[in-house]
Protein backbone atom coordinates (compact mmCIF):
# COMPACT_ATOMS: atom_id res chain seq x y z
CA UNK A 1 0.00 0.00 0.00
CA UNK A 2 2.39 2.63 1.20
CA UNK A 3 6.09 2.51 1.44
CA UNK A 4 7.92 5.45 2.96
CA UNK A 5 9.41 5.02 6.42
CA UNK A 6 9.22 7.79 8.96
CA UNK A 7 6.79 10.59 8.29
CA UNK A 8 4.96 10.64 5.02
CA UNK A 9 5.95 13.89 3.45
CA UNK A 10 5.43 15.95 0.39
CA UNK A 11 9.09 15.25 -0.45
CA UNK A 12 7.90 11.83 -1.57
CA UNK A 13 7.51 11.82 -5.34
CA UNK A 14 5.16 9.28 -6.86
CA UNK A 15 6.67 8.11 -10.18
CA UNK A 16 4.93 9.39 -13.31
CA UNK A 17 6.44 7.34 -16.13
CA UNK A 18 4.48 7.24 -19.38
CA UNK A 19 3.69 3.88 -20.99
CA UNK A 20 6.39 4.55 -23.60
CA UNK A 21 8.98 5.31 -20.91
CA UNK A 22 7.95 2.24 -18.90
CA UNK A 23 8.28 0.02 -21.99
CA UNK A 24 11.75 1.42 -22.61
CA UNK A 25 12.69 0.60 -18.99
CA UNK A 26 11.65 -3.04 -19.40
CA UNK A 27 13.87 -3.32 -22.47
CA UNK A 28 16.89 -1.39 -21.17
CA UNK A 29 16.94 -2.86 -17.64
CA UNK A 30 15.58 -6.38 -18.17
CA UNK A 31 16.33 -6.98 -21.85
CA UNK A 32 12.72 -7.80 -22.72
CA UNK A 33 10.58 -6.39 -25.54
CA UNK A 34 7.08 -5.19 -24.67
CA UNK A 35 4.10 -6.00 -26.90
CA UNK A 36 1.47 -4.34 -24.69
CA UNK A 37 1.50 -2.26 -21.50
CA UNK A 38 -1.14 -0.70 -19.27
CA UNK A 39 -1.03 1.06 -15.88
CA UNK A 40 -2.25 -0.64 -12.70
CA UNK A 41 -3.60 1.19 -9.62
CA UNK A 42 -1.11 1.95 -6.85
CA UNK A 43 -1.03 3.93 -3.60
CA UNK A 44 2.20 5.90 -3.94
CA UNK A 45 4.33 3.84 -6.35
CA UNK A 46 3.70 3.09 -10.03
CA UNK A 47 2.83 -0.32 -11.48
CA UNK A 48 2.33 -1.51 -15.06
CA UNK A 49 0.90 -4.74 -16.45
CA UNK A 50 3.33 -5.73 -19.18
CA UNK A 51 2.93 -8.31 -21.97
CA UNK A 52 6.29 -9.58 -23.21
CA UNK A 53 6.93 -9.97 -26.95
CA UNK A 54 8.64 -13.17 -28.03
CA UNK A 55 11.90 -12.72 -29.95
CA UNK A 56 14.72 -15.04 -31.01
CA UNK A 57 16.56 -14.04 -27.83
CA UNK A 58 13.58 -14.31 -25.44
CA UNK A 59 11.97 -17.59 -26.45
CA UNK A 60 11.26 -18.61 -22.87
CA UNK A 61 10.39 -16.76 -19.67
CA UNK A 62 7.12 -15.16 -18.56
CA UNK A 63 4.52 -13.88 -21.02
CA UNK A 64 3.08 -11.34 -18.58
CA UNK A 65 4.80 -9.29 -15.88
CA UNK A 66 4.26 -6.41 -13.48
CA UNK A 67 6.76 -3.56 -13.67
CA UNK A 68 7.05 -1.98 -10.21
CA UNK A 69 8.54 1.52 -9.96
CA UNK A 70 9.08 2.62 -6.35
CA UNK A 71 8.56 6.20 -5.20
CA UNK A 72 11.57 8.41 -4.44
CA UNK A 73 11.49 7.77 -0.68
CA UNK A 74 11.27 3.97 -0.97
CA UNK A 75 14.00 4.08 -3.59
CA UNK A 76 16.35 5.41 -0.90
CA UNK A 77 16.04 2.09 0.98
CA UNK A 78 17.41 -0.47 -1.51
CA UNK A 79 18.37 -2.92 1.29
CA UNK A 80 14.74 -3.07 2.43
CA UNK A 81 13.44 -3.64 -1.10
CA UNK A 82 16.09 -6.32 -1.67
CA UNK A 83 14.96 -8.18 1.47
CA UNK A 84 11.28 -7.87 0.51
CA UNK A 85 12.07 -9.22 -2.96
CA UNK A 86 14.02 -12.18 -1.55
CA UNK A 87 11.07 -12.90 0.77
CA UNK A 88 8.80 -13.15 -2.28
CA UNK A 89 11.25 -15.67 -3.78
CA UNK A 90 11.56 -17.58 -0.48
CA UNK A 91 7.78 -17.88 -0.07
CA UNK A 92 7.35 -19.07 -3.65
CA UNK A 93 9.95 -21.79 -3.04
CA UNK A 94 7.98 -22.75 0.09
CA UNK A 95 4.82 -23.26 -1.98
CA UNK A 96 3.03 -19.91 -1.55
CA UNK A 97 1.37 -18.32 -4.63
CA UNK A 98 3.75 -15.36 -4.87
CA UNK A 99 5.25 -13.95 -8.06
CA UNK A 100 8.56 -15.01 -9.59
CA UNK A 101 11.21 -12.31 -9.77
CA UNK A 102 12.67 -11.42 -13.17
CA UNK A 103 16.34 -10.52 -12.90
CA UNK A 104 17.95 -7.54 -14.59
CA UNK A 105 20.49 -7.86 -17.39
CA UNK A 106 23.11 -7.55 -14.65
CA UNK A 107 21.50 -10.48 -12.76
CA UNK A 108 20.13 -8.32 -9.91
CA UNK A 109 16.61 -8.34 -8.43
CA UNK A 110 16.19 -4.58 -8.90
CA UNK A 111 17.82 -1.60 -10.59
CA UNK A 112 18.08 2.08 -9.66
CA UNK A 113 17.26 4.35 -12.60
CA UNK A 114 17.84 8.09 -12.62
CA UNK A 115 15.58 10.55 -14.41
CA UNK A 116 16.60 14.13 -15.17
CA UNK A 117 13.48 16.28 -14.98
CA UNK A 118 15.39 19.41 -15.94
CA UNK A 119 15.38 21.01 -12.49
CA UNK A 120 16.68 17.92 -10.64
CA UNK A 121 17.64 14.27 -11.01
CA UNK A 122 15.37 11.75 -9.28
CA UNK A 123 16.13 8.07 -8.73
CA UNK A 124 13.61 5.22 -8.79
CA UNK A 125 14.06 1.53 -7.98
CA UNK A 126 12.51 -0.73 -10.60
CA UNK A 127 11.62 -4.42 -10.39
CA UNK A 128 9.88 -6.87 -12.69
CA UNK A 129 7.70 -9.64 -11.26
CA UNK A 130 5.63 -12.26 -13.04
CA UNK A 131 1.93 -11.44 -13.37
CA UNK A 132 -0.25 -13.69 -11.19
CA UNK A 133 -3.59 -15.10 -12.41
CA UNK A 134 -6.91 -14.53 -10.70
CA UNK A 135 -9.06 -11.66 -9.54
CA UNK A 136 -9.05 -9.75 -6.26
CA UNK A 137 -11.27 -11.22 -3.56
CA UNK A 138 -12.81 -7.73 -3.32
CA UNK A 139 -14.82 -8.71 -6.42
CA UNK A 140 -16.63 -11.68 -4.87
CA UNK A 141 -18.83 -12.22 -1.81
CA UNK A 142 -16.49 -13.92 0.69
CA UNK A 143 -18.06 -16.79 2.62
CA UNK A 144 -16.95 -18.27 5.96
CA UNK A 145 -14.79 -21.00 4.41
CA UNK A 146 -12.74 -18.55 2.33
CA UNK A 147 -12.36 -16.22 5.34
CA UNK A 148 -11.06 -19.19 7.34
CA UNK A 149 -8.59 -20.07 4.56
CA UNK A 150 -7.35 -16.47 4.37
CA UNK A 151 -6.79 -16.40 8.14
CA UNK A 152 -4.91 -19.68 7.87
CA UNK A 153 -2.84 -18.35 4.97
CA UNK A 154 -1.85 -15.24 6.95
CA UNK A 155 -0.64 -17.35 9.88
CA UNK A 156 1.21 -19.84 7.67
CA UNK A 157 2.97 -16.99 5.87
CA UNK A 158 4.23 -15.41 9.10
CA UNK A 159 5.15 -18.81 10.55
CA UNK A 160 7.12 -19.77 7.42
CA UNK A 161 9.08 -16.52 7.59
CA UNK A 162 10.53 -17.61 10.94
CA UNK A 163 12.93 -19.65 8.79
CA UNK A 164 13.88 -16.77 6.46
CA UNK A 165 17.44 -15.47 6.74
CA UNK A 166 19.16 -12.65 4.88
CA UNK A 167 22.23 -10.53 5.70
CA UNK A 168 20.12 -7.36 5.45
CA UNK A 169 17.15 -8.68 7.45
CA UNK A 170 17.55 -5.92 10.05
CA UNK A 171 16.17 -3.47 7.44
CA UNK A 172 12.71 -4.86 8.33
CA UNK A 173 13.00 -3.13 11.72
CA UNK A 174 11.37 -0.01 10.27
CA UNK A 175 11.33 2.62 12.99
CA UNK A 176 8.31 4.91 12.73
CA UNK A 177 7.05 3.17 9.57
CA UNK A 178 3.62 4.76 9.33
CA UNK A 179 1.87 1.53 8.21
CA UNK A 180 3.21 -0.62 11.05
CA UNK A 181 0.41 -0.99 13.60
CA UNK A 182 2.86 0.06 16.32
CA UNK A 183 2.88 3.53 14.70
CA UNK A 184 -0.79 4.34 15.46
CA UNK A 185 0.21 7.26 17.78
CA UNK A 186 1.94 8.90 14.77
CA UNK A 187 -1.50 9.37 13.17
CA UNK A 188 -2.02 12.45 15.35
CA UNK A 189 -0.02 14.60 12.96
CA UNK A 190 -2.38 13.72 10.07
CA UNK A 191 -5.71 14.22 11.87
CA UNK A 192 -6.16 17.67 10.32
CA UNK A 193 -7.03 15.88 7.05
CA UNK A 194 -10.31 14.70 8.66
CA UNK A 195 -11.58 18.12 9.73
CA UNK A 196 -13.62 18.34 12.94
CA UNK A 197 -16.34 15.68 13.11
CA UNK A 198 -17.51 12.44 14.76
CA UNK A 199 -15.01 10.42 12.72
CA UNK A 200 -12.12 12.41 14.13
CA UNK A 201 -13.44 12.00 17.68
CA UNK A 202 -13.48 8.21 17.29
CA UNK A 203 -9.94 8.19 15.88
CA UNK A 204 -8.69 10.34 18.76
CA UNK A 205 -10.25 7.92 21.26
CA UNK A 206 -8.71 4.91 19.51
CA UNK A 207 -5.25 6.52 19.50
CA UNK A 208 -5.51 7.24 23.24
CA UNK A 209 -6.68 3.70 24.02
CA UNK A 210 -3.83 2.37 21.87
CA UNK A 211 -1.29 4.37 23.89
CA UNK A 212 -2.80 3.24 27.19
CA UNK A 213 -3.46 -0.43 26.42
CA UNK A 214 -1.47 -1.65 23.41
CA UNK A 215 1.84 0.18 23.85
CA UNK A 216 2.07 -1.20 27.39
CA UNK A 217 1.40 -4.78 26.17
CA UNK A 218 3.84 -4.99 23.24
CA UNK A 219 6.44 -6.90 25.27
CA UNK A 220 3.84 -9.66 25.79
CA UNK A 221 3.12 -10.10 22.05
CA UNK A 222 5.09 -12.65 20.01
CA UNK A 223 7.26 -11.04 17.36
CA UNK A 224 7.40 -12.09 13.71
CA UNK A 225 7.76 -10.66 10.22
CA UNK A 226 4.41 -9.26 9.00
CA UNK A 227 3.18 -9.01 5.42
CA UNK A 228 1.27 -6.07 6.84
CA UNK A 229 -1.18 -5.47 3.99
CA UNK A 230 -3.29 -8.57 3.32
CA UNK A 231 -6.18 -6.53 1.99
CA UNK A 232 -8.94 -7.63 -0.36
CA UNK A 233 -7.06 -6.27 -3.38
CA UNK A 234 -3.77 -8.00 -2.51
CA UNK A 235 -5.20 -11.53 -2.39
CA UNK A 236 -6.16 -13.06 -5.74
CA UNK A 237 -8.46 -16.03 -6.22
CA UNK A 238 -9.46 -18.38 -9.03
CA UNK A 239 -12.74 -20.28 -9.06
CA UNK A 240 -13.70 -23.77 -10.09
CA UNK A 241 -16.96 -25.69 -9.88
CA UNK A 242 -17.64 -28.23 -7.15
CA UNK A 243 -19.40 -31.55 -7.77
CA UNK A 244 -22.60 -29.81 -6.61
CA UNK A 245 -22.23 -26.97 -9.12
CA UNK A 246 -21.15 -24.36 -6.54
CA UNK A 247 -18.21 -22.04 -7.09
CA UNK A 248 -15.13 -23.13 -5.14
CA UNK A 249 -12.46 -20.49 -4.64
CA UNK A 250 -8.74 -20.98 -4.25
CA UNK A 251 -6.11 -18.34 -3.46
CA UNK A 252 -3.98 -17.90 -6.60
CA UNK A 253 -1.85 -14.93 -5.66
CA UNK A 254 -0.48 -12.84 -2.79
CA UNK A 255 0.56 -9.35 -3.85
CA UNK A 256 2.33 -6.25 -2.53
CA UNK A 257 5.06 -7.01 -0.01
CA UNK A 258 6.06 -3.34 0.25
CA UNK A 259 4.64 -2.93 3.77
CA UNK A 260 6.59 -5.84 5.24
CA UNK A 261 8.22 -5.13 8.57
CA UNK A 262 8.88 -6.71 11.92
CA UNK A 263 5.70 -6.79 13.95
CA UNK A 264 3.67 -9.36 15.86
CA UNK A 265 1.44 -12.31 15.02
CA UNK A 266 -1.56 -10.52 16.50
CA UNK A 267 -0.90 -7.53 14.20
CA UNK A 268 -1.20 -9.74 11.12
CA UNK A 269 -4.53 -11.27 12.11
CA UNK A 270 -5.93 -7.86 13.13
CA UNK A 271 -4.94 -6.30 9.80
CA UNK A 272 -6.42 -9.24 7.88
CA UNK A 273 -9.71 -9.10 9.82
CA UNK A 274 -10.05 -5.38 9.19
CA UNK A 275 -9.56 -5.67 5.42
CA UNK A 276 -11.87 -8.68 5.12
CA UNK A 277 -14.60 -6.60 6.81
CA UNK A 278 -14.47 -3.85 4.16
CA UNK A 279 -16.75 -5.40 1.52
CA UNK A 280 -18.72 -7.69 3.84
CA UNK A 281 -22.48 -7.34 4.28
CA UNK A 282 -22.04 -8.75 7.83
CA UNK A 283 -18.69 -7.20 8.82
CA UNK A 284 -18.79 -7.96 12.55
CA UNK A 285 -19.14 -11.70 11.84
CA UNK A 286 -15.98 -11.74 9.68
CA UNK A 287 -13.48 -11.65 12.53
CA UNK A 288 -14.40 -15.02 14.02
CA UNK A 289 -13.86 -16.94 10.78
CA UNK A 290 -10.51 -15.25 10.02
CA UNK A 291 -9.42 -15.77 13.64
CA UNK A 292 -10.35 -19.47 13.52
CA UNK A 293 -8.21 -19.97 10.42
CA UNK A 294 -5.30 -18.05 11.90
CA UNK A 295 -5.47 -19.92 15.21
CA UNK A 296 -5.49 -23.29 13.43
CA UNK A 297 -1.81 -22.49 12.76
CA UNK A 298 -0.86 -19.92 15.44
CA UNK A 299 -3.18 -19.89 18.48
CA UNK A 300 -3.18 -16.46 20.14
CA UNK A 301 -2.30 -16.01 23.80
CA UNK A 302 -4.92 -14.48 26.15
CA UNK A 303 -3.04 -11.14 26.10
CA UNK A 304 -2.97 -11.12 22.28
CA UNK A 305 -6.67 -11.99 22.09
CA UNK A 306 -7.44 -9.23 24.56
CA UNK A 307 -5.82 -6.67 22.24
CA UNK A 308 -7.48 -7.85 19.03
CA UNK A 309 -10.57 -5.60 19.10
CA UNK A 310 -8.52 -2.45 19.64
CA UNK A 311 -5.95 -3.49 17.01
CA UNK A 312 -8.68 -3.95 14.37
CA UNK A 313 -10.10 -0.51 15.25
CA UNK A 314 -6.57 0.91 15.06
CA UNK A 315 -6.00 -0.48 11.57
CA UNK A 316 -9.27 1.07 10.42
CA UNK A 317 -7.99 4.40 11.77
CA UNK A 318 -4.61 4.03 10.03
CA UNK A 319 -6.20 3.26 6.69
CA UNK A 320 -8.89 5.94 6.90
CA UNK A 321 -6.70 8.77 8.20
CA UNK A 322 -3.82 8.12 5.78
CA UNK A 323 -6.23 7.82 2.84
CA UNK A 324 -7.74 11.23 3.68
CA UNK A 325 -4.24 12.70 4.01
CA UNK A 326 -3.01 11.12 0.75
CA UNK A 327 -6.09 12.42 -1.09
CA UNK A 328 -4.95 15.95 -0.32
CA UNK A 329 -1.55 15.16 -1.86
CA UNK A 330 -2.82 13.12 -4.83
CA UNK A 331 -6.42 14.17 -5.58
CA UNK A 332 -6.18 12.51 -9.01
CA UNK A 333 -5.78 9.12 -7.24
CA UNK A 334 -8.81 9.61 -4.98
CA UNK A 335 -10.88 6.70 -6.31
CA UNK A 336 -8.16 4.17 -5.43
CA UNK A 337 -7.12 5.85 -2.18
CA UNK A 338 -10.66 5.97 -0.80
CA UNK A 339 -11.61 2.30 -1.36
CA UNK A 340 -11.58 1.63 2.39
CA UNK A 341 -13.42 4.85 3.25
CA UNK A 342 -16.57 3.82 1.32
CA UNK A 343 -17.55 1.42 4.11
CA UNK A 344 -14.68 1.77 6.60
CA UNK A 345 -16.05 4.65 8.66
CA UNK A 346 -19.40 2.89 8.99
CA UNK A 347 -17.75 -0.38 10.13
CA UNK A 348 -15.47 1.41 12.61
CA UNK A 349 -18.42 3.28 14.09
CA UNK A 350 -20.42 0.05 14.36
CA UNK A 351 -17.56 -1.64 16.24
CA UNK A 352 -17.24 1.33 18.55
CA UNK A 353 -20.99 1.51 19.21
CA UNK A 354 -21.23 -2.23 19.97
CA UNK A 355 -18.16 -2.14 22.21
CA UNK A 356 -15.31 -4.53 22.76
CA UNK A 357 -17.17 -7.09 24.87
CA UNK A 358 -20.03 -7.63 22.40
CA UNK A 359 -17.73 -7.85 19.36
CA UNK A 360 -15.29 -10.21 21.11
CA UNK A 361 -18.15 -12.48 22.10
CA UNK A 362 -19.16 -12.88 18.44
CA UNK A 363 -15.57 -13.40 17.26
CA UNK A 364 -14.54 -15.84 19.96
CA UNK A 365 -17.76 -17.89 19.84
CA UNK A 366 -17.45 -18.19 16.06
CA UNK A 367 -13.80 -19.23 16.35
CA UNK A 368 -14.71 -21.76 19.05
CA UNK A 369 -17.37 -23.32 16.82
CA UNK A 370 -14.64 -24.47 14.42
CA UNK A 371 -13.06 -26.56 17.19
CA UNK A 372 -16.23 -28.65 17.37
CA UNK A 373 -16.49 -28.79 13.60
CA UNK A 374 -19.49 -26.46 13.36
CA UNK A 375 -18.85 -23.18 11.56
CA UNK A 376 -21.31 -20.37 12.30
Swiss-Prot record:
<feature type="active site" description="Proton acceptor">
    <location>
        <position position="229"/>
    </location>
</feature>
<dbReference type="InterPro" id="IPR002575">
    <property type="entry name" value="Aminoglycoside_PTrfase"/>
</dbReference>
<protein>
    <recommendedName>
        <fullName>Hydroxylysine kinase</fullName>
        <ecNumber>2.7.1.81</ecNumber>
    </recommendedName>
</protein>
<keyword id="KW-0963">Cytoplasm</keyword>
<keyword id="KW-0808">Transferase</keyword>
<dbReference type="GO" id="GO:0019202">
    <property type="term" value="F:amino acid kinase activity"/>
</dbReference>
<dbReference type="InterPro" id="IPR050249">
    <property type="entry name" value="Pseudomonas-type_ThrB"/>
</dbReference>
<dbReference type="InterPro" id="IPR011009">
    <property type="entry name" value="Kinase-like_dom_sf"/>
</dbReference>
<comment type="function">
    <text>Catalyzes the GTP-dependent phosphorylation of 5-hydroxy-L-lysine.</text>
</comment>
<keyword id="KW-0418">Kinase</keyword>
<comment type="similarity">
    <text>Belongs to the aminoglycoside phosphotransferase family.</text>
</comment>
<dbReference type="GO" id="GO:0005737">
    <property type="term" value="C:cytoplasm"/>
</dbReference>
<dbReference type="Pfam" id="PF01636">
    <property type="entry name" value="APH"/>
</dbReference>
<dbReference type="GO" id="GO:0047992">
    <property type="term" value="F:hydroxylysine kinase activity"/>
</dbReference>
Amino acid sequence: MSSGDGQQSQALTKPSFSEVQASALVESVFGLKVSKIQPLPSYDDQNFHVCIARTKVTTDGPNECVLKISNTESSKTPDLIEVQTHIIMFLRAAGFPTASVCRTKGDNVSSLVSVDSGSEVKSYLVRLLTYLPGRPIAEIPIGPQLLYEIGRLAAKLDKTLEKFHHPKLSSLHRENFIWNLKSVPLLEKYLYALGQNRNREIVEQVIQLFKDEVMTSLSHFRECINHGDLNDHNILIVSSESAFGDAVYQVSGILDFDDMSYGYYVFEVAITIMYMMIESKTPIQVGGHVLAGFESVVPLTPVERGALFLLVCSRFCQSLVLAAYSCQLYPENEEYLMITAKTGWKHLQQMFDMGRKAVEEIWFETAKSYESGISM
